[in-house]
Structure formats: C-alpha cells, structure tokens
Amino acid sequence: MIKIKCEAMLKQQMRASAYHLKPADIKKLVIASSNFRDRCIIKTLYWLGLRRHELVNLDVRDIDFERKRVNVRRGKGEKTRIVPMVDDEYVGDLKHLIGGHAEGPIFLSNQNKALSLRAVNYIIEYIGQKAGIENPHPGRKHLNPHIFRHSIARFLKSKGFSAEWIQNFLGHQSYKTTMDMYGTISIDEMQEEAVRKLGE
C-alpha cells in the first residue's frame, strides 16, 4: 500500500504541467531560430498557448489585429475560442509574417503548404538543441510544442492572472483541469522557495 502511494505521488510530482521554460529560455529559443517563420512559431506557441494542431490550423482569417484577438480552431466542426494577443512585439512579428495575405495557413512549409504536426515537432526539437535547452521534465530529453503551453500558463499565474482567465485562455472545458494542472506550485517555484527559506 505504501509503495503504491509513493508511486502515485511520484507520478503526480512528475506531471508535465509542473515543468516549464522560463521567459529567459523563450528569448534564447527565439534568438536561436533559423528563420523568421520559426521565430514566429516559437512566439505563437508561447504567447497564444496553442496546441500544435491549433498552430497548423491557424489561418490568416483567424487574426483580428485591430482588436488583438485570435480565433483558435481546434478542428473541423469543433468549438473555437477567442485568445487575446498580449505581447505587442509578437503582434508586430505576426503582421510582418502574414504580409499582404488575406487568407490561407499562416505557417507554411518550403513547399508552400501548411506545416505538418511532425514538422512542428522537428522545428521545436531542432531549435532547442541549437539553443542548448533541454526539456525540463526529467522523463523527456528534447523540447516539444506542448512545453510552451505549460510555460505561458505558469508565467501568467506568476503575474497574478486568475485560474478562470487561464482556463479560458487555454481552452480547458473544465475549471478543475486548470486547477489540477496549474493550481499547484511548480518545480522551479519549489526550488526557489526552498533556497529562499533555507538560506535565511
């Protein structure tokens, strides 16, 4: 019984949402990006908290620059959510990337087609290796697209955003899901608190 409880606690501690990148890591990844498109992919995954399939589904028509909003589509026939663009530098970059296009996928491959999910994985892993940044999760070596979603959620939480705001931002159907994932303290926060209190 004790062993089972210990294993359950270990799994809980190793939840992916407890591990995230810091803003300084995001900047390093942006700098290490091979081209402007990849830089915008990093920023979009982070500043919009998108899942990778939401990223590849993103269309020029989904962007409302005037109101700084993005219409995020999960898939055909599925519900959409409205996400605010909260970083002005990112808004400027996205405008530049889209240029004069009125419609079509925002992120294109070298063949001028929408990026595949596999391509997004490769781009993130490659940039992570180039920047020398590994996945903070002990069970995963390379960066993956979802780490940016965890990272922006933790960043917003640290800035005092409510769990309800983060729930709507990420598109969680359940408030409980948001609280289970981000209502707890992160590994970095645990370490920082330990250093602060034990060093007193």
Per-range role (PLM):
Residues 75-95, 104-126:
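C-terminal catalytic core of Y-nucleophile DNA break-rejoin enzymes
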Residues 63-65, 116, 161-181:
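Short, polar N-cap/turn motifs at the start of nucleic acid-interacting alpha helices
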Residues 1-11, 50-53, 118, 127:
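N-terminal DNA-binding recognition helix of tyrosine site-specific recombinases/integrases
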Residues 45-67:
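Short, charged phosphate-coordinating catalytic segments
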Residues 83-84, 180, 184-200:
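DNA/chromatin major-groove-contacting recognition/catalytic segments
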Residues 19-52, 77:
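Basic, Lys/Arg- and aromatic-enriched nucleic-acid-binding interface segment
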Residues 1-28, 73-76, 113:
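Flexible interdomain linker/hinge and immediately adjacent N-terminus
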Residues 122-168:
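Short, basic (Lys/Arg/His-rich) helix/loop patches that form interaction surfaces
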